[in-house]
A protein has these predicted regions:
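AAA+ P-loop NTPase catalytic core and its hallmark functional loops
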Residues: 2-222
Length: 222
């Protein structure tokens, strides 16, 4: 409850005053990013692709494209993304999306600790900064179960997934540096799943992707 109240107060502080419409007051410093949190690690066994879905995903990652995967749970989507990042030494910023995902999770929110107040960046500006610091000038933002988020929360990703490749957080514009790429990979569950929302038209227009299916008995016998 305290965090929600503080977040509302912080948002109110960002609104311009009537006397000066351009005025903005930002009251807290932004916490530093620990880039070691986003180093890739290898997950489990190797993914066995059915056709060319893994190759297609890999190509999109290396080009810094937005890629959308629709498929049931348990197909190995998350494992494959992490293992491809490990293979190519690409830092990865993950988020498990849900109905409860808030704007603060994506953009950031004010926090308090024993040293005072600070602004904790969300995954969107964090992913941009991680990409800018990456040795290979590329990073991956992995948004699992993207369509579990409400429409207004989905829309908060628009400026990162379109040509702007930027986001404003705590009064600072976080922008990909020239030559730096950010691959945004999102997974969605089929519409038959509970707690699933439709994708906004904005999201549909910003991703390429494919539908993945469970292997058939014939596939398992290969």
């Amino acid at each position: 409850m305290e965090n929600n109240t503080m977040e509302k107060q912080f948002i109110e502080s960002l609104k311009p005053t009537q006397a000066d419409p351009s005025a903005r007051t930002y009251k807290v410093p932004t916490a530093e990013i620990d880039y070691t949190n986003y180093l890739p690690t290898k997950w489990g066994v190797e993914y066995v692709q059915l056709s060319d879905e893994a190759d297609e995903l890999e190509a999109c990652l290396l080009k810094g494209m937005n890629y959308l995967i629709e498929g049931d749970k348990g197909l190995g989507k998350t494992q494959l993304v992490h293992n491809l990042c490990f293979k190519h030494k690409l830092p990865i910023v993950p988020i498990n999306c849900s109905e409860g995902t808030k704007i603060g999770d994506l953009i950031g929110r004010p926090q308090i600790n024993e040293f005072g107040s600070y602004f904790q960046l969300g995954v969107l500006p964090t992913a941009i900064e991680v990409a800018n610091k990456s040795e290979h000038k590329i990073a991956v933002l992995y948004m699992d179960e993207f369509n579990a988020m409400r429409h207004e929360i989905q829309k908060a990703t628009n400026s990162v997934t379109d040509d702007r490749r930027s986001i404003v957080a705590n009064g600072t514009t976080y922008q990909l540096n020239e030559g730096v790429r950010l691959a945004v990979v999102a997974t969605i569950n089929p519409s038959t799943y509970a707690g699933v929302n439709t994708l906004t038209e904005d999201a549909k227009s910003r991703f390429v992707g494919a539908t993945w299916e469970y292997p058939s008995s014939e596939d398992m016998e290969r």
